[in-house]
């Protein structure tokens, strides 16, 4: 049986400002880096992957030191298109933003971006490879939520309920999972 460790990157300035941030390659905030330094994860022998985004690379380095790892863009966050790096307050009066929020939010595509369903399809197409051996994946909240929602549909949680706090995540073995404190 293999174990998949899903860990969300540490906080960025965009997280602190409640900005939509998916495709923008931001570093960790100073607060995010300091919070990660207080965490201690003991993970047995495993391969390491990141999404390749700066915030995931920095999180890996802080949590596990200089370990060999692979980057996989399949595990990048959703692309929010023209809404990227804006807050709800900045966007709330835009007609295209309201259209994106209305109806099936997972199917709606932000202008010049990708839908939640498109991101999920991208992530799930790469997931079987991760399940072949013990793997630590440092990635993004939406990616982790998509994986957890697909692995545990019987939990009947929505995507936002699966999304871990920065620096946190899940360890998944077969059909057993546990939150990483």
Question: What kind of feature is each model-predicted range?
Answer:
Residues 12, 143-144:
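Short active-site segment of divalent metal-dependent hydrolases/proteases
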Residues 27, 67-74, 155-164:
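Short hydrophobic/aromatic-enriched beta-strand-loop microsegments
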Residues 154-180:
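Domain-level recognition of soluble alpha/beta enzyme cores
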Residues 63-122:
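Phosphate-handling substructures
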Residues 4, 46, 133-142:
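Generic beta-sheet signal
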Residues 50-51, 121, 138-139:
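Short beta-strand scaffold positions
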């Amino acid at each position: 049986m293999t174990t998949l460790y899903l860990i969300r990157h540490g906080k960025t300035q965009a997280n602190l400002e409640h900005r939509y941030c998916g495709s923008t390659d931001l570093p960790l905030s100073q607060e995010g880096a300091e919070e990660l330094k207080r965490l201690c994860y003991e993970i047995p022998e495993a391969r390491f992957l990141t999404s390749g985004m700066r915030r995931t690379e920095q999180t890996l380095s802080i949590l596990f030191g200089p370990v060999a790892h692979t980057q996989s863009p399949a595990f990048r966050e959703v692309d929010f298109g023209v809404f990227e790096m804006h807050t709800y307050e900045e966007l709330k009066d835009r007609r295209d933003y309201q259209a994106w929020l209305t109806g099936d939010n997972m199917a709606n595509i932000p202008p010049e971006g990708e839908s939640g369903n498109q991101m999920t399809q991208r992530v799930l197409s790469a997931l079987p490879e991760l399940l072949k051996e013990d793997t630590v994946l440092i990635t993004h909240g939406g990616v982790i939520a998509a994986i957890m929602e697909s692995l545990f549909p019987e939990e009947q949680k929505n995507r936002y309920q699966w999304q871990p706090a920065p620096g946190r995540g899940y360890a998944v073995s077969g059909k057993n999972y546990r939150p990483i404190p």
